[in-house]
Amino acid sequence: MELAPAIPGTDRFDRTDREVTQAHPGVTAFVGRAARSREEREAGLDAALAPGATRPVGAGHRSRPEAPDPYRLCFERDLDRVKHSRPWRRLAGKCQVFIAPEDDHLRTRLTHAVEVAQVATGIARAVDLCLPLTEAIALAHDCGHGPAGHASEEAFSPYLPTTGYDHAVYGADVTLAPLNLCHETLDGVRNHSWRRPPPATPEGEVVAWADRIAYVCHDFQDAVRAGILTPDDLPDDVRTAVGARSSDQIGSFVLAVLAAIDQTGHVGMTEPAASALRTFRDFNFERIYLRPAARRQAERVIRLLRGLVDCFADAPRRLPEPDAADVEPGSTAATALAVRYVSGMTDRYALGLGVELLGWRPDDLPRGV
């Protein structure tokens, strides 16, 4: 194949430079421009973003000041750090709803985060919000979750009497703290739950809606696959308003968010989709999350995780922390370290330690049903 014809204004490039290694000999694909600096990209974005969108400037606002990257926007650095972090990778081993499922196609916290990012960036792209900030918040929003589902919050809360354990707050303030993310990213993580104060950015508000849209739709889909529900169980009001298929439902909810932004300039959702989302979520709580079998498993999760926290708090030398050996057993500091360690565990690891350290019989371990 011959080289692509010359592109006007690109004659300064030497496409035969012998000091450059290429993956494919004889490659003809041509970029035709040099990399733009971060400052140039920031200037271009300033004109392209919506008036209320969050502008990436310099290194961003961080707890520990950093020099800016020559090419990457500050929120792109956050996004890269999240993707390369251990807490985010461990989400692959944490359940979304069903603990230790035998079906490999049921969602994990990681696949949920990816789906939230897809929904959120789709909305953000349509209204010219800051995409890397939106995606960083979406991918990181559940990094504070403990093993074995939402029951971990109930398990850990007594050990943190001042604040309790809220996965959103703990994720932003403890789990993700070593990454030194921008304040805007951490704010979106901290406040993505609807019971929290509103996020400070429209990107964070978009993620809050995307999270609810994603989990309401895909948790029902997973419950059908697990045999807990059938497609016919879907409430009629939901079916009428947004359809029966998950793809139709997500599409309808996203269009309703965009319609609300068109009408008001603020992130929200128009009717009848908003009522359908509430009905759908209430149905999921009744028939999936709070059904008797799920509550029985949650009680096992709570006993298991509290047993592990007590075990490590009473023997902090077991903890893989550099300063754990100097901590007084049973102290507040030891308990805080134990909660941080146990909350980061995957389901498989926590269940394994239940057998190894606590003497649980495998048949007594929590299992998703």
Q: What residues fall within each predicted segment?
A:
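Histidine-centered, transition-metal-coordinating active-site segments
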Residues: 1-109, 118-123, 130-132, 151-152, ...
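Catalytic glutamate of the conserved HExxH
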Residues: 142, 146, 155, 212
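Active-site-proximal cofactor/substrate-binding loop regions of enzyme domains
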Residues: 112, 134-144
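Conserved N-terminal alpha-helix of the aminotransferase class I/II PLP-enzyme fold
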Residues: 115
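Aromatic/His-enriched, Gly/Pro-containing loop or helix-boundary segments
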Residues: 162
